[in-house]
Amino acid sequence: MKISSRTAYITVATMGIVSLFGDVVYEGGRSLIPEYLKFLGASAILVGTVTGAGEFIGYILRLVSGSLADRTKAYWVFIFLGYGLIAVVPLLGLAPSYEIAIIFVILERVGKALRSPSRDAVISVVSKGIGSGKAFGLHELLDQIGAIGGPSLVAAMMFWSSNNYSSTFILLFIPFAALVVALLYAYKKVGRNVQPEVKEAAKGNKRLDKHFYLYNVAIGLSTVGLIPVALILYKGASIVEPSQQWLIPVLYVVVQAVDAPIALIAGLAFDRVGIKMLVLPLAASFLPMLFISYGGLTEVILACIAYGVVLGMQESIYRAAISGLAPAGARGTAYGIFNMFLGLGVIVAGPIFGLFLESQLMILPLAYVAVTQVAAIFLLLQSTKHTPDEEISL
């Protein structure tokens, strides 16, 4: 069975447009969540813990949803349910306390858990004719246009409304409506056409070998040593004046603006170099903590740029590598497992880096990051000693 390059490009592009509108909503909201929780009374440790816990719950659920998607072949059902839960982001504007806001934050992560494995499985299956690196890089590029637009919209609204959190979040109902329209169009345009091909590809070999698991342990360990972007923004919020809090979403825009082109460039390079390309983002994961350890707002901006570089490669080539390590019949499960290991790293990193920020012990976190990334690189290189048992034919 062969999926044409034209079908592959159309599928990746339409799914990218859906993700674009999704990112306008949830990345716009997420750019404001750290300082919003702080405004509602949450501490740095709580923000770090909630960020990590929300990500972890979402990632664990991806293992379940990915496995269910492989078993039921109902990939588009999970995609629709997952994108539908983005509605909780505008509802943050109605939260009366940080406890309620935390529930909404976690629900948004649940939605991402439902949609991500199925969406990535669909993209990975159709990417054979154009290259998995290019496919995920292109998808991430479109995705990041929304990720830039969302925080920009939020920053403008915060400035215009004199830092009115409620009005800013409620405004996000408008792009959410556009998301619903785009998703319905995407399913009508390509969903029905590629669904039979995705189902057919998913009938094959479902075995995941030790190299796949070594890779995932490496990714999880690297994430343990990467400071969460929420805490970079929290650091920024503690530096700027109260009247300048609208600058924090702008910092998040910087992250996404760097992420977008890096994702496509890294994806194209991955198709040429292969999985060893991942040594670069693992090594670069040291930089964000280095920058915020010394200095003020300028260093926070540099940390955002460095984080954007890592994130761009993470969102494209981390995902693309799964295509070469997992057979098509287990892609939903494989992406679920991948995200579970990623989530284990996030849940550990959140409170650890939160403690580092509050303790202001800068040498210790730098040593911690260096050790975790070196160990992750070692495991990654071990996972590359892999000759596939079969060429994954789609």
Model-derived regions: residue spans:
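Transmembrane alpha-helix termini and helix-breaking/packing motifs in multi-pass membrane transporters
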Residues: 35, 39, 149-167, 348-364
